[in-house]
Amino acid sequence: THAMLLDALSGQQDEYQDLFNDNRITFSEAMAKLYQRINPHIDMGQRTAQTIGEELLDYRNYLELEVEVFRGADGWLRAESGALSTGEAIGTGMSILLMVVQSWEEESRRIRGKDIVPCRLLFLDEAARLDGKSISTLFELCERLDMQLLIAAPENISPEKGTTYKLVRKIAGNQEHVHVVGLRGFGATE
């Protein structure tokens, strides 16, 4: 049934365009209504069109992803989210992210027929939970992969390379200002 949905979308048949030109419904709802038109024999139950559409757009309904981590003498073990160390969780997430980014870039090159250098940004929130070694590993990985790393943390992270910026909010009277203070890396350059 999902193949029929993809076929209807790729064929861009006129009979379905009314769903995607209607500003009163969301894209998720349009997907659900398209799915219902193609599969009238399937009972959707009490679920809303929004819920059905979100399920259709959720990649987890199309992929079964298993990740293994190498644990020294124990060898390769299946990664369970609750049993991963912070470093393993970051590494697992990074490996998935990098594969997605690389496939997007390859597809973009294929479609456009041009070798455009992408702007590769990696965003990391809650960086205060990471130790210095984990942060250094992220910096090294981003440097090797030609990515820029943007970190959000409640305290300063002193980089060996690159620049960190501290945002300081100041209120004077009825006006609020944000001061940006930059700290340049102090590590040795090669």
Swiss-Prot record:
GO CC, any one term: nucleoid
InterPro entries assigned to the protein according to its UniProt record, in alphabetical order: MukB/SMC (IPR050308)
TM region positions: none
GO molecular function, one term: DNA binding
Keywords per UniProt: Cell cycle, Cell division, Chromosome partition, Cytoplasm, DNA condensation, DNA-binding
Localization (cell): Cytoplasm, Nucleoid
Gene3D superfamilies: 3.40.1140.10
GO BP terms: cell division; chromosome condensation; chromosome segregation
Function in brief: Plays a central role in chromosome condensation, segregation and cell cycle progression. Functions as a homodimer, which is essential for chromosome partition. Involved in negative DNA supercoiling in vivo, and by this means organize and compact chromosomes. May achieve or facilitate chromosome segregation by condensation DNA from both sides of a centrally located replisome during cell division.
Record note on quaternary structure: Homodimerization via its hinge domain. Binds to DNA via its C-terminal region. Interacts, and probably forms a ternary complex, with MukE and MukF via its C-terminal region. The complex formation is stimulated by calcium or magnesium. Interacts with tubulin-related protein FtsZ.
Family: Belongs to the SMC family. MukB subfamily.
Record text about domains: The hinge domain, which separates the large intramolecular coiled coil regions, allows the homodimerization, forming a V-shaped homodimer.
Name of the protein described by the UniProt record: Chromosome partition protein MukB
Annotated organism of origin: Haemophilus aegyptius
